[in-house]
């Protein structure tokens, strides 16, 4: 009875671990048998497993035996003689189940992943192991590749700079390693290809994401973008860079730090309009100027040097707020980067046009099965379940965790806090205990460094400015008397090994100088200490002037301190303070989750359209005969034409035959005249139009030959689809920027976005049909050899578009108006664009 009651009160994670333990016991029971096998017999198990899968055995049924094979192979094939611990077996099972395994630092996530990778690779569909950078992809493919190759599986790696041929070969391997960037960009590049041989990626079957929280949460708002140079607008950014410093905060503009937004006041707007010599900044013709002004305001008021970005070698480089690293090759979106370049006095690059884009959220959800591993995921489990359908299972450590996490120490001012941190570091240094101090940005790390220099304490500083020394600095961080000051760079993916005699001193002591918005980032910093059962300790020093408490904390804290009469230098330890910190972090985490969820809701609409376009493109690219495709397109176009000029809703006497003849003349159709449509009903006219178009197609094909015709159609169709899709992406961006203001009119912005984007998409697909048929019929063939150059991908600029959660959030009080359209005509009125069509069949589609 007591056991039954205990089972009721067990948490879900404990119950899950008990289920996993049964499978682990089964794997362990097979170990003696596996040890008796020769290398050849062990390797032959791969062939045997594949045959059993063909006969109908499931991967779940194979799992215990396959995992036992991998464990034995690891001991025989690696120089380290790796043997998977039971907790690593548990992690491997969780990954196979398409869940997230939370495994603490130093617990061997990389080795644990070899188990489900091998098992799932047996299907022959390929497995992708996704890391956060090229270095880890290359290292892990070589390191863990020893195990796979020993068992007869092929291993590939995708790295930046590889040729399409090299990439294709890597994807054809049983196991493919690569960074999240490379996998995402290959998907986009494949959907810009003009030759089937240039498509490299293949099917998306099963992926394991290392540091899954970094990829799916921290970078969820960071779309992958392939872009090219657009119009020249750099002079306007320089113009605003001269105007904004003359504006006064509070009088001319207001800044909302909590929501990271800025907007002009009425007085500021009048001042700017006077300097620009325009009457209304928010007129339609000044839309671009208004947008650039807004970005320039953000650059000057919200974006901070040495926190959000650094200037290095005459370039503005983004600093990742979660990792503290430089984000090479990435640029802030929507002109913000250009505004910062103007602010910092470096060369202002041209803005760009988007050719293709996708978010990590939608890219990785395309996999049949997705799993992930990280040291910090439990705090974000709700998001993983709701967005990705992935549960989080917390895997116990192989050895008990003995790190001591001390209570936070709170000060009234930032100055007092850093003074106390410096004194704490001095005490630890005198004792000989190594210390790692985490700061939130470069500026704070340099401030603390100056304080330690004044105390005569030797130390190392690790931040985005000297990231090339990272390996050397981290290598020494666990030695006696070592003091390391680091931004979040040391918070993830680093393994600090303790030097001789350090365990006796208490291990590595970690000091956090500020609470991050996310508890995960704090936990990552703590996790640098106490790895694999080592001793260690951690403590956070915070102040009421820190951004988290200042912007999201309760005002009651300051009132409490005033009543209790605390001095600035006096540390505070109070349950109310601790609770307030926790509430503030949870509040911000929930808020950021809602932002990511909203972005995904909008992106899902775009994603459906992307899937339709890319599927159409894929069919064209791989088709051997496109005549049927063109015939289907002709029928759809004829239906559009009939609805426009010969509507069934009007009497035949009112049909616009003249307009029809004029429109058809643009297509170079053969033998067409007004007599063809006299005294005929709609169906007869429809049949006649299809017949004429078909005859035109056949004559064109006879003139240039079937093979050349197929080549012509393929290149023409792909080029027209790409051009219209690019324009559509720009139009959707403009719609998205202005749609939030619909809320002021008591209309749901998301619903409005759905309807308008649907109309825009239908209009684009109709334009694609029209342009393909019109261009196909109008092309004059000078020679039998048709040579249409595709878009030159080499000229495209591959970059990451960084949507900063600090600078691209929707404005609370926006002054810029949404995209203004003229009074909307009736659906049956002539379209105001002058095409001669009805509005519903032209711009109203």
Swiss-Prot record:
<dbReference type="GO" id="GO:0017038">
    <property type="term" value="P:protein import"/>
</dbReference>
<dbReference type="InterPro" id="IPR011130">
    <property type="entry name" value="SecA_preprotein_X-link_dom"/>
</dbReference>
<dbReference type="GO" id="GO:0008564">
    <property type="term" value="F:protein-exporting ATPase activity"/>
</dbReference>
<keyword id="KW-0547">Nucleotide-binding</keyword>
<dbReference type="GO" id="GO:0043952">
    <property type="term" value="P:protein transport by the Sec complex"/>
</dbReference>
<keyword id="KW-0811">Translocation</keyword>
<dbReference type="InterPro" id="IPR014018">
    <property type="entry name" value="SecA_motor_DEAD"/>
</dbReference>
<comment type="similarity">
    <text>Belongs to the SecA family.</text>
</comment>
<keyword id="KW-0479">Metal-binding</keyword>
<dbReference type="InterPro" id="IPR011115">
    <property type="entry name" value="SecA_DEAD"/>
</dbReference>
<dbReference type="InterPro" id="IPR036670">
    <property type="entry name" value="SecA_X-link_sf"/>
</dbReference>
<keyword id="KW-0067">ATP-binding</keyword>
<feature type="binding site">
    <location>
        <position position="833"/>
    </location>
    <ligand>
        <name>Zn(2+)</name>
    </ligand>
</feature>
<dbReference type="InterPro" id="IPR000185">
    <property type="entry name" value="SecA"/>
</dbReference>
<comment type="subunit">
    <text>Monomer and homodimer. Part of the essential Sec protein translocation apparatus which comprises SecA, SecYEG and auxiliary proteins SecDF. Other proteins may also be involved.</text>
</comment>
<keyword id="KW-0472">Membrane</keyword>
<feature type="binding site">
    <location>
        <position position="831"/>
    </location>
    <ligand>
        <name>Zn(2+)</name>
    </ligand>
</feature>
<dbReference type="GO" id="GO:0006605">
    <property type="term" value="P:protein targeting"/>
</dbReference>
<dbReference type="InterPro" id="IPR044722">
    <property type="entry name" value="SecA_SF2_C"/>
</dbReference>
<dbReference type="Pfam" id="PF07517">
    <property type="entry name" value="SecA_DEAD"/>
</dbReference>
<protein>
    <recommendedName>
        <fullName>Protein translocase subunit SecA</fullName>
        <ecNumber>7.4.2.8</ecNumber>
    </recommendedName>
</protein>
<dbReference type="Pfam" id="PF07516">
    <property type="entry name" value="SecA_SW"/>
</dbReference>
<dbReference type="InterPro" id="IPR020937">
    <property type="entry name" value="SecA_CS"/>
</dbReference>
<feature type="binding site">
    <location>
        <position position="843"/>
    </location>
    <ligand>
        <name>Zn(2+)</name>
    </ligand>
</feature>
<keyword id="KW-0963">Cytoplasm</keyword>
<feature type="region of interest" description="Disordered">
    <location>
        <begin position="804"/>
        <end position="838"/>
    </location>
</feature>
<dbReference type="InterPro" id="IPR001650">
    <property type="entry name" value="Helicase_C-like"/>
</dbReference>
<feature type="binding site">
    <location>
        <position position="495"/>
    </location>
    <ligand>
        <name>ATP</name>
    </ligand>
</feature>
<keyword id="KW-1278">Translocase</keyword>
<dbReference type="InterPro" id="IPR036266">
    <property type="entry name" value="SecA_Wing/Scaffold_sf"/>
</dbReference>
<dbReference type="InterPro" id="IPR014001">
    <property type="entry name" value="Helicase_ATP-bd"/>
</dbReference>
<feature type="compositionally biased region" description="Basic residues">
    <location>
        <begin position="809"/>
        <end position="818"/>
    </location>
</feature>
<feature type="binding site">
    <location>
        <position position="88"/>
    </location>
    <ligand>
        <name>ATP</name>
    </ligand>
</feature>
<dbReference type="InterPro" id="IPR027417">
    <property type="entry name" value="P-loop_NTPase"/>
</dbReference>
<dbReference type="GO" id="GO:0046872">
    <property type="term" value="F:metal ion binding"/>
</dbReference>
<dbReference type="InterPro" id="IPR004027">
    <property type="entry name" value="SEC_C_motif"/>
</dbReference>
<dbReference type="GO" id="GO:0031522">
    <property type="term" value="C:cell envelope Sec protein transport complex"/>
</dbReference>
<comment type="function">
    <text>Part of the Sec protein translocase complex. Interacts with the SecYEG preprotein conducting channel. Has a central role in coupling the hydrolysis of ATP to the transfer of proteins into and across the cell membrane, serving as an ATP-driven molecular motor driving the stepwise translocation of polypeptide chains across the membrane.</text>
</comment>
<dbReference type="GO" id="GO:0005886">
    <property type="term" value="C:plasma membrane"/>
</dbReference>
<dbReference type="Pfam" id="PF02810">
    <property type="entry name" value="SEC-C"/>
</dbReference>
<keyword id="KW-0653">Protein transport</keyword>
<keyword id="KW-1003">Cell membrane</keyword>
């Amino acid at each position: 009875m007591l056991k039954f009651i205990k089972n009721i009160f067990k948490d879900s994670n404990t119950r899950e671990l008990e289920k996993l333990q049964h499978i682990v016991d089964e794997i362990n029971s097979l170990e003696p048998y596996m040890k008796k096998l020769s290398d050849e017999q062990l390797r032959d198990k791969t062939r045997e497993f594949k045959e059993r899968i063909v006969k109908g055995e499931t991967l779940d049924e194979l799992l215990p035996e396959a995992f036992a094979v991998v464990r034995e192979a690891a001991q025989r094939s690696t120089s380290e003689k790796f043997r998977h611990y039971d907790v690593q077996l548990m992690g491997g099972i969780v990954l196979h189940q398409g869940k997230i395994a939370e495994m603490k630092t130093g617990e061997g996530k990389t080795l644990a992943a070899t188990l489900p990778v091998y098992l799932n690779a047996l299907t022959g569909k390929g497995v992708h192991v996704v890391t956060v950078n090229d270095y880890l992809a290359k290292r892990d493919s070589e390191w863990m590749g020893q195990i796979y190759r020993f068992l007869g599986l092929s291993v590939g790696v995708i790295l930046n700079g590889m040729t399409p041929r090299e990439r294709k070969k890597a994807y054809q391997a049983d196991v493919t390693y690569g960074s999240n960037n490379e996998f995402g960009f290959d998907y986009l590049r494949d959907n810009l290809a003009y030759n089937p041989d240039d498509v490299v990626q293949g099917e998306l079957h099963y992926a394991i994401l290392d540091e899954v929280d970094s990829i799916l949460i921290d970078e969820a708002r960071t779309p992958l973008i392939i872009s090219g140079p657009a119009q020249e607008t750099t002079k306007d950014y320089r113009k605003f860079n001269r105007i904004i410093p003359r504006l006064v905060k509070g009088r001319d503009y207001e800044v909302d730090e909590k929501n990271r937004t800025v907007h002009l006041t009425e007085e500021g707007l009048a001042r700017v309009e006077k300097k620009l010599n325009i009457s209304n900044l928010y007129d339609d013709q000044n839309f671009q100027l208004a947008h650039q002004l807004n970005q320039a305001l953000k650059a000057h008021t919200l974006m901070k040097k040495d926190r959000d970005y650094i200037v290095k070698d005459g370039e503005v480089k983004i600093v990742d707020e979660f990792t503290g690293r430089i984000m090479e090759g990435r640029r802030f979106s929507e002109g913000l980067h250009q505004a910062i370049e103007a602010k910092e006095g470096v060369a202002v690059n041209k803005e760009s046009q988007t050719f293709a884009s996708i978010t990590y959220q939608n890219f990785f959800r395309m996999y049949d099965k997705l799993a992930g591993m990280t040291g910090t995921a439990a705090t974000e489990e709700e998001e993983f379940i709701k967005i990705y359908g992935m549960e989080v299972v917390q895997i116990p450590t192989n050895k008990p965790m003995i790190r001591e996490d001390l209570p936070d120490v709170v000060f009234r001012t930032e100055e007092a806090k850093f003074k106390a941190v410096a004194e704490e570091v001095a005490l630890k240094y005198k004792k000989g205990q190594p210390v790692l101090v985490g700061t939130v940005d470069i500026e704070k790390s340099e401030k603390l460094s100056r304080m330690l220099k004044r105390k005569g304490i030797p130390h190392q500083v690790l931040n985005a400015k000297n990231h090339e020394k990272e390996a050397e600095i981290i290598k020494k961080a666990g030695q006696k008397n070592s003091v390391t000051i680091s931004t979040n760079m040391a918070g993830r993916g680093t393994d600090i090994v303790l030097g001789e005699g350090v365990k006796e001193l208490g291990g590595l002591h970690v000091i956090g100088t500020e609470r991050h918005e996310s508890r995960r980032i704090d936990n990552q910093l703590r996790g640098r200490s106490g790895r694999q059962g080592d001793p260690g300790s951690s403590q956070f020093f915070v102040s009421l002037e820190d951004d988290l408490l200042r912007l999201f904390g309760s005002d009651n804290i300051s009132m409490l301190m005033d009543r209790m009469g605390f001095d600035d230098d006096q540390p505070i330890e109070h349950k109310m303070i601790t609770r307030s910190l926790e509430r503030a972090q949870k509040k911000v985490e929930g808020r950021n989750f809602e932002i990511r969820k909203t972005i995904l809701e909008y992106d899902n609409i775009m994603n459906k359209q992307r899937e339709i376009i890319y599927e159409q493109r894929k069919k064209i690219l791989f088709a051997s005969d496109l005549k049927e495709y063109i015939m289907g397109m002709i029928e759809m176009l004829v239906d559009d034409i009939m609805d426009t000029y010969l509507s069934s809703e009007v009497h035949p006497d009112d049909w616009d035959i003249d307009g029809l003849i004029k429109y058809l003349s643009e297509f170079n159709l053969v033998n067409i005249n007004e007599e063809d449509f006299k005294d005929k009903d709609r169906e007869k006219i429809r049949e006649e139009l299809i017949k004429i178009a078909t005859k035109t197609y056949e004559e064109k094909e006879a003139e240039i030959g079937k093979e050349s015709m197929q080549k012509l159609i393929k290149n023409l169709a792909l080029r027209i689809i790409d051009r219209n899709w690019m324009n559509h992406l720009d139009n959707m961006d403009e719609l998205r920027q202005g749609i939030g203001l619909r809320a002021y009119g008591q209309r749901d912005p998301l619903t409005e976005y759905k309807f308008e984007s649907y109309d825009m998409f239908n209009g684009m697909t109709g334009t694609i049909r029209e342009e393909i048929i019109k261009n196909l019929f109008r092309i004059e063939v000078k020679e039998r050899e048709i040579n249409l150059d595709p878009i030159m991908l080499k000229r495209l600029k591959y970059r990451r578009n960084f949507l900063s959660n600090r600078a691209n959030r929707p404005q609370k009080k926006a002054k810029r108006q949404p995209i203004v359209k003229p009074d909307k005509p009736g659906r049956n009125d002539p379209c105001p664009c002058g095409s001669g069509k009805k509005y519903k069949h032209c711009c109203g589609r």
